[in-house]
Curated annotation (Swiss-Prot):
Gene Ontology CC annotations of this record: external side of plasma membrane
Taxonomic lineage from the root: Eukaryota, Metazoa, Chordata, Craniata, Vertebrata
GO terms under biological process: immune response; T cell activation
Organ and tissue specificity: Expression detected only in placenta.
CDD domains registered for this protein in UniProt: IgI_hCEACAM_2_4_6_like, IgV_CEACAM_D1
PANTHER family: CARCINOEMBRYONIC ANTIGEN-RELATED CELL ADHESION MOLECULE 1, CARCINOEMBRYONIC ANTIGEN-RELATED CELL ADHESION MOLECULE 19
Free-text function comment from the UniProt entry: Possibly involved in cell adhesion.
Protein name: Cell adhesion molecule CEACAM3
Family classification: Belongs to the immunoglobulin superfamily. CEA family.
Extent of the signal sequence: 1-34
Cited InterPro entries: CEA_cell_adhesion, Ig-like_dom, Ig-like_dom_sf, Ig-like_fold, Ig_sub, Ig_sub2, Ig_V-set, Immunoglobulin_dom
Length: 709
């Protein structure tokens, strides 16, 4: 009969019985030395975030391990895990937000200031001996969003923690916003969902994980969808794909890139087989700045090099190609005029916009017609930061900006008001009942489907709308209507573009293109019309979406080639015979929707809308610092303040992009930079750059002096 290592205790809860055993063992036995280590992932955690206290080198032949809050007080137990019975027993200070894993790690969700403090892991052997006591101090930072409101998102996403690791270390691919009502979760090595590339799957019904063909024995999959990779090698670098399958058989997919730092290889000798890789320099770029997609280890004997926007090798998504034989580059359909391709394969993007964010694919073709493909993700910092007195504007961003047929599109809502009664999504610029997709009531926390709901839309409580399996018919303008508690109404519009790999001119579909897509105040914008219908009797332009006389800009009669100016004509509009409209000297008042209305000879009508985005050049920001002279090991906070909204923030140190260390942290809106603790090398000049899609400005320098005691 097996002898229990837990002392009997009448009228004790399971936790107290286990606690009594552990307490007595503390008196009887001295802990032995064990190389158990605990790492906080991420190293800095802000209120409301999640943190994993990741355990390495957990001893073998254990009967149990216990986590408790503090250094010595065993009564502050969080949870105990029995390896014998594979069961978790929660302790007195368990808040309901902690999850204990069989590898010893502790997961804390939605952390608060009360979670700050020491955490201790104690391991107990099969003989009842204490094997190790290991402690870690967790510091939860106050949310520093006073300079701007963070955008919320219900989109499935993955965070690599840490963002870049060295060979032999561990990485956690942390899943955020996992959908509800899941059937299974899958991880794949690469950017393609293919059975042979499956690392592991987690089946909700059986609460178990199953390794796949691509499992190396070093991956651990958790019930929250996260994937832990231990003892990573440079072969682990690259893209990983997370796929979720819900009970209604709907799927969602998210990608993450694992970066393995192999710089030490130069000291140990070159690798036996150089791997083709692409590096984004810098890793995150502000709008208006430039970024280089730097290619490493380009193969020899090449015939051509190709760059594509996205992860799919479609001709319409080709940015540029470089032909080795002619030593020349050829521009592709997806070239925006801001890309420069070099003979070493690298691609330079200038004046980056939020539309440039996403994946890019490099394809090489050798003289023996062998191809290699590698992906890189471009991260564009579009976080807004503004003066705390400036209200945050309700905005909607389509993610991705241009979707391929069959992909999913998230209409991501930012700055949803708190005091709302309900919100409604419409598949049109008109807020009519027949165009209603769904209505969300905050009072009862319920979504009502409307007549325009196709069965592919999912509405989230943060206002965002997910459109799955997009088709050509989903292209167009969508309207979000907000109804406040005082019954005030606010609306916002967003354009959804679904690529069908066919140019609009071949479809005969009437479309309008804004040239340029983002307009600086005082500049000109052309609303360029494609595929104007034949046999027209007349066409009219309106400011807004309502076809009423007071909003009419101009009416053109085809037969008489005569134009009539309407009440909404400002004197700055020019109408061309092909239907296009040129707006001179644009102002902020010109921002918004415009409607082209056509009537043919059979009195059949057609209307189409376009949105003009007009931006003011940003004003120069300034930096506020808590102290300009600080002592070593103290802390300092720098805040970038701007009078503009809808801007991106980039921090500069000594005229170079600031490289964040583990001692530095940014607020979610990038407005505040915290350094804790301060070191001597932090002394120097700090600047912040504020940018929007049409301009950027840099603050005057602020000098930080570090006093060495």
């Amino acid at each position: 009969m097996e002898l229990s290592s837990v002392l009997p205790c009448k009228r004790c809860t399971p936790w107290r019985g286990l606690l009594l055993t552990a307490s007595l063992l503390t008196c009887w036995l001295l802990p032995t030395t064990a190389q158990v280590s605990i790492e906080s992932l991420p190293p800095q955690v802000v209120e409301g975030e999640n943190v994993l206290l990741h355990v390495d080198n957990l001893p073998e032949n254990l009967i149990a391990f216990v986590w408790y809050k503090g250094l010595t007080n065993m009564s502050l137990g969080v949870a105990l895990y029995s390896l014998t019975y594979n069961v978790t027993v929660t302790g007195p200070v368990h808040s309901g937000r902690e999850t204990l894993y069989s590898n010893g790690s502790l997961w804390i969700q939605n952390v608060t200031q009360k979670d700050t403090g020491f955490y201790t892991l104690r391991t107990i052997s099969n003989h009842g001996e204490i094997v190790s006591n290991t402690s870690l101090h967790l510091h939860v930072y106050f949310s520093t969003l006073t300079c701007g409101r963070a955008a919320t998102s219900a989109q499935l996403s993955i965070e690599s923690v840490p963002t870049s690791i060295s060979k032999g270390e561990s990485a956690l691919l942390l899943a955020h916003n996992l959908p509800e009502n899941l059937r299974a979760i899958f991880w794949y090595k690469g950017a393609i969902v293919f059975k042979d590339l499956e690392v592991a799957r987690y089946v909700i019904g059986t609460n178990s994980s199953v390794p796949g063909p691509a499992h190396s024995g070093r991956e651990t999959m958790y019930s929250n969808g996260s994937l832990l990779l231990q003892n990573v090698t440079r072969n682990d670098a690259g893209f990983y794909t997370l796929k979720t399958l819900s009970t209604d058989l709907k799927t969602e997919i998210a990608y993450v890139q694992l970066q393995v730092d192999t710089c030490f290889m130069s000291y140990a000798g070159p690798p036996t087989s150089a791997q083709l890789t692409v590096e984004s320099a810098p890793t995150s770029v502000a709008e208006g700045a430039s970024v280089l997609l730097l290619v490493h280890n380009l193969p020899e004997n090449l015939r051509a090099i190709f760059w594509y926007k996205g992860v799919i090798l479609f001709k319409d998504l080709e940015v540029a190609r470089y032909v080795i034989g002619t030593n020349s580059s050829v521009l592709g359909p997806a070239h925006s005029g801001r890309e420069t391709m070099y003979s070493n394969g690298s691609l330079l993007l200038q004046n980056v916009t939020r539309n440039d964010a996403g994946f890019y694919t490099l394809r090489t073709l050798s003289t023996d017609l062998k191809a290699k493909v590698v992906h890189v993700q471009l991260q564009v910092n579009t976080s807004s930061c503004c003066d705390p007195l400036t209200p945050a504007l309700l905005t909607i961003d389509p993610v991705p900006r241009h979707a391929a047929k069959g992909e999913s599109v998230l209409l991501q809502v930012r700055n949803l008001p708190e005091d709302l009664r309900m919100f409604i999504w419409f598949k049109s610029v008109y807020t009519s009942q027949i165009f209603k997709i769904a209505e969300y009531s905050r009072a009862i926390n319920y979504v009502f489907r409307g007549p325009a709901h196709s069965g592919r839309e999912t509405v989230y409580t943060n206002g965002s709308l997910l459109l799955q399996d997009a088709t050509e018919k989903d292209t167009g303008l969508y309207t979000l209507q907000i109804i406040y508690r005082n019954f005030k109404i606010e609306t916002a519009h967003v354009q959804v573009s679904v690529h069908t790999c066919v140019h609009p001119s071949t479809t005969g579909q009437l479309v309008i293109e804004s040239v340029p897509p983002n307009v600086v105040e005082g500049g000109d914008v052309l609303l360029l019309v494609h595929n104007m219908p034949e046999n027209l009797q007349s066409f009219s332009w309106y400011k807004g979406v309502a076809i009423v006389n007071r909003h009419e800009i101009s009416r053109n009669i085809i037969a008489s080639n005569r134009s009539t100016l309407g009440p909404a004509h400002s004197g700055r509009e020019t109408i061309y015979s092909n239907g296009s409209l040129l707006l001179h000297n644009a102002t902020e008042e010109d921002n918004g929707l415009y409607t082209l209305w056509t009537v043919n000879r059979h009195s059949e009508t057609q209307g189409i809308h376009v949105h003009i985005h007009i931006y003011k050049p940003v004003a120069q920001p300034f930096i506020r610092v808590t102290e300009s002279s600080v002592r070593v090991k103290s802390s300092v906070v720098l805040t970038c303040l701007s009078a503009d909204t809808g801007t991106s923030i980039q921090w500069l140190f000594n005229n170079q992009n600031l490289r964040l260390t583990q001692r530095m942290s940014l607020s979610q809106t990038k407005c505040q930079l915290s350094i804790d603790p301060v070191r001597r090398e932090d002394a120097g000049e700090y600047r912040c750059e504020v940018s929007n899609p049409v301009s950027s400005k840099t603050s005057l320098p602020v000098s930080l002096d570090v006093i060495i005691e």
